[in-house]
Structure formats: C-alpha cells, structure tokens
C-alpha cells in the first residue's frame, strides 16, 4: 500500500473514481490513447481548460482535498454529530469549493477538479492510501457540486486490431477473476484458486500481442465495473493490480499505465 503509483496511472484511476461519483448523471469518463488526427484539437481544448483553471481561485477546493490525508481512512466514515465543529467547517469549505467551481466554464469543471487533485498528489508526493483518499474527496466534490464529467469518445486505430484478440481470450476472464480475488482482500499469500487464476491470466496475456495486453486489462476492468463487480475504491485497487500483471507473467510491457 505504501508504493507510489505512477502519476499517469493514478490520474486514470482518479478519473474512474470521479466518474463513479457522478453516476447519478449516467455519465462515464475514461482515458484512452488518441490518434494523431484528433489529438491536436482535443489536446488544445484540454490545454485551454488548464489555462483557465490556473487563473481561477480554487483555494477552498484545494483545502478540502488537503484534509483528506488526515481526516479519514478508506472505507472509514467520519462521525457526523449535530453541531460538530469539524463537520461544519468541512461543509462550509465544500460549499465554498462548489461556488468556486461554478466560476469555471461548464466544460472545464471536471478538468478543474482533476487538475487540483493531480497537483495535490504530485506536490505532496502522496503514497498509496493518501493518494486514494484525495481521489475519493475529488469524487465528493464532483457529486456534491453537480459537476458533469462527460464521456470522452476518443479512439485509436490500434484498438480495432486488439478487439479481436481480446474477444478470443474471452475478455481475459481469468484476469478478471484474479483481480476480483485480489481486490476482495484474500491476503498477501495466494491461495490455490488465486494461483490458478493467475496462471490462466498469464496464458491469456501470452496469447496476445504486446500492444494489446494493457488495453485488454483495461477493458476487463471496465466490464467488471459496468456489471457492478467493482465500485469506489475497489476500482482503484483493480487498476493497481492490473498494472503489474504483465510483469508478474513475464511479458511486455513490464507495467501498464492506464
């Protein structure tokens, strides 16, 4: 849990957790590699949002996220007593954060929350559970402030070639099983069932081209999430587990950055 997750991978997980918090709006946000023909236009839009965010005062949101490293642990609820001073302060900061977010253009609000959460993680050099709590608090901002994180429909030609391989490997069913076992917290020592699932997962990956393995794992987790098998912080753990599966199986790439 103390391992520092690569920022690129963490940001991807952060987006999935934020999207889960926005489920009431029936929207999903994903990070997918983009092709060169669309990259310049979409990259320009993202850059414009970043520039706008840098000009805005989002200090209340920053303070609200900063509290995450000391106030609670994953899965631990804060005791909310009537008149509790800490709770009143948190609620006030969250409301102030929402007011600040509303000063940002609608299409840039999700990017704003992502940006300040990224900054907290990078500047604070947060590890494991601390970075996860920042992601959870970012999700609270999204749901409480009514921010709509729209789905990105970017495509990559290479994904078309991978689709057939992923289907041939039954959407990496054994990898899904192994990830589910790991997320459920069956302990550091692998059971016989876990060993079998891992071997089956490695067989799936070895039958695929290198450039398709991480895409296959990403789609496997997305499928589990859409079926309700993974929610909240479980999504975070699933991506963390999947990131290291190629290395565990002795195939390339050594790490998936989702």
Swiss-Prot record:
Q: What post-translational modification does the entry describe?
A: The N-terminus of both large chains is blocked.
Q: Does the keyword DNA damage apply?
A: no
Biotech applications = Ric C 3 constitutes the peptidic component of the immunomodulator Inmunoferon.
Keyword terms, alphabetized: Allergen, Cleavage on pair of basic residues, Disulfide bond, Phosphoprotein, Pyrrolidone carboxylic acid, Seed storage protein, Signal, Storage protein
What is the disulfide pattern of this chain?
49-108, 61-97, 98-145, 110-149, 162-212, 175-201, 202-249, 214-256
Residue ranges the record assigns to the propeptide: 25-35, 77-86, 154-156, 191-193
- Post-translational modification Phosphoserine, affected residues: 69
Instruction: Name the residue ranges with Basic and acidic residues bias.
Output: 73-83
Where Pyrrolidone carboxylic acid occurs, the residues are: 87, 194
Q: Where is this region: Disordered?
A: 64-87
Return the similarity comment.
Belongs to the 2S seed storage albumins family.
The UniProt record's further free-text remark is:
The allergen Ric c 1 small chain acts as a calmodulin (CaM) antagonist that inhibits CaM-dependent myosin light chain kinase with IC(50)= 0.25 uM.
Q: What is this protein called?
A: 2S seed storage albumin protein
| Annotated organism of origin | Ricinus communis (Castor bean)
**Species classification:** Eukaryota, Viridiplantae, Streptophyta, Embryophyta, Tracheophyta
